[in-house]
């Protein structure tokens, strides 16, 4: 069955704040069964709306399906809140997290320093990730993003570096101990290939085009390293559709971030005239798959890959990130932000459709952190940047961005983010939880610990 979303009557479930985790699961199990019997879940799909807090979701809902409507991500059954904070090197709270520390929290179950990727806050040592644990237990694994596949959120599953900027072999200035010459495992791109997820889809071609400087692939690009490891390297939707599950797939659809879907005037001092967003970006190449397409492709490839492996009860672990919600909010670009939020919601719908066809499925939705967006009275005169939009239902909505001076990058916020779930173990997300709690939910669902 396919879900019909839009102006729906209220269903059990909460307004989500940011990311969606779909777990393919079995009937709820007791704690003893989780420890000693079959895992409650066969597969997990974790979808992350980067920077997609309550205001970002509400703005997208208002603009598209209306204030009384419901997005796909609004339809999950159990809901709660997650804290979002990092720590410093001494373990003291840092109340606003970045995406690296935020992703490390759910990927490893431990907090770390802002900018650090799946390494400890005090000793700077690698910490095992959900993807690594799932892979080592025989699950197929994958990561889909609209950022570079070497960006902070996907990197938290596949790499361990001191600083998130160390994406390719030429980017290692902030990570001397992580270089191969320094005794480390190399850049995020190199480590990601070495981690060997079955599916990697997103941007980041420029990072993979860099030349490896040390180790067995010295003098070759990271893309060549991937091909040597058996990866099918695809560059557009046609090549993605032709990929086969017998070998791992690396999709590089853009030099860095995948171009956004919508465009429009940015927020400005004193506001803008009421406007509509342009729902087609002329700067987006025609062959670029959208996030829902990439999600469906990854689900099909991983399902087939898991079946081919034949491990009893083992499906897959997949993370899907809508990265440019955060990127566009940083730039006070309301139309870009709304378009990416709605593109993410279509990926959520694709995941829910998959889960409906594969009944051992649990869905969890959350975010890494909040962002700068505020929904203001249409006649307000805010001190910061603002833009006024005319929604699909004919309303007037003013969005404000006031966490930085005009011309500077808007900031994350330290608020809790919504989390919601559907399926067995969904009740684990209820209440107010720590931002490391998803690690425990996923490991329990897949029987990883």
Swiss-Prot record:
Cofactor or coenzyme needed = Mg(2+); Zn(2+)
KW Nucleus (keyword) present: no
Q: What is this protein called?
A: Streptomycin-6-phosphate phosphatase
Mind listing the UniProt keywords for this protein, alphabetically?
A: Antibiotic biosynthesis, Hydrolase, Magnesium, Metal-binding, Phosphoprotein, Secreted, Signal, Streptomycin biosynthesis, Zinc
Does the keyword field hold Translocase?
Answer: no
- Positions binding Mg(2+) in this chain are 50, 151, 153, 321
Q: Which range is the signal sequence, renumbered to this chain?
A: 1-32
Q: List residues binding Zn(2+) 2.
A: 50, 368-369
Looking up SMART domains in the UniProt record yields: alkPPc
Location of region: Disordered? 268-290
- For this protein, the Enzyme Commission number is 3.1.3.39
The record ties this protein, via Pfam families, to: Alk_phosphatase
**Which GO molecular function terms does the record list?**
alkaline phosphatase activity; metal ion binding; streptomycin-6-phosphatase activity
Q: Quote the gene name from the UniProt entry.
A: strK
Residues forming coiled coils: none
> Where, in this chain's numbering, is Zn(2+) 1 bound?
326, 330, 412
Q: Which organism is it from?
A: Streptomyces griseus
- Family the UniProt entry places it in: Belongs to the alkaline phosphatase family.
The UniProt entry, under PANTHER family, shows: ALKALINE PHOSPHATASE
């Amino acid at each position: 069955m396919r879900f019909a979303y839009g102006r729906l009557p209220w269903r059990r479930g909460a307004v989500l704040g940011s990311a969606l985790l779909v777990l393919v699961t079995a009937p709820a199990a007791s704690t003893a069964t989780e420890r000693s019997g079959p895992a409650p879940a066969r597969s997990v799909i974790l979808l992350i709306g980067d920077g997609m807090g309550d205001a970002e979701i509400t703005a997208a809902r208002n603009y598209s399906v209306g204030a009384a409507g419901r997005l796909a991500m609004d339809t999950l059954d159990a809901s709660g809140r997650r804290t979002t904070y990092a720590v410093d090197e001494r373990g003291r709270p840092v109340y606003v997290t970045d995406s690296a520390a935020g992703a490390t929290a759910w990927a490893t179950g431990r907090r770390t320093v802002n900018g650090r990727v799946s390494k400890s806050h005090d000793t700077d040592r690698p910490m095992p990730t959900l993807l690594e644990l799932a892979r080592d237990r025989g699950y197929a694994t994958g990561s889909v993003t609209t950022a570079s596949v070497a960006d902070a959120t996907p990197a938290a599953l596949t790499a361990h570096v001191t600083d998130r900027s160390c994406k390719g072999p030429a980017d290692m200035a902030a990570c001397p101990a992580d270089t191969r010459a320094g005794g480390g495992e190399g850049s995020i791109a190199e480590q990601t290939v070495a981690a060997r997820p079955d599916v990697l889809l997103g941007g980041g071609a420029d990072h993979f085009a860099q030349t490896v400087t040390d180790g067995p692939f010295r003098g070759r690009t990271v893309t060549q390293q991937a091909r040597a490891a058996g990866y099918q390297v695809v560059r557009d939707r046609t090549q993605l559709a032709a990929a086969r599950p017998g070998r791992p797939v690396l999709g590089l659809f853009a030099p860095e971030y995948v171009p956004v879907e919508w465009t429009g005037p940015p927020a400005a001092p004193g506001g803008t005239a009421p406007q509509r967003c342009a729902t087609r970006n002329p700067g987006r190449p025609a062959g670029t798959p959208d996030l829902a397409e990439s999600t469906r492709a990854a689900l099909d490839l991983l399902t087939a890959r898991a079946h081919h492996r034949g491990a009893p009860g083992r499906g897959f672990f997949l993370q899907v990130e809508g990265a440019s919600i955060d990127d566009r909010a940083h730039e006070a670009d309301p139309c870009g932000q709304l378009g990416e939020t709605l593109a993410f919601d279509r990926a959520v719908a694709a995941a829910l459709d998959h889960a409906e066809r594969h009944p051992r499925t649990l869905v969890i939705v959350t975010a890494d952190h909040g962002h700068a967006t505020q929904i203001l009275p249409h006649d307000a005169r805010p001190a910061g940047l603002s833009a006024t939009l005319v929604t699909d239902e004919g309303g007037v909505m003013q969005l404000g961005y006031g966490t930085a001076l005009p011309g500077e990058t808007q900031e994350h916020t330290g608020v809790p983010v919504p989390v919601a779930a559907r399926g067995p173990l969904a009740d684990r997300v209820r209440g107010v939880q720590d931002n490391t709690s998803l690690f425990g939910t996923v490991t329990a669902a897949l029987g990883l610990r």
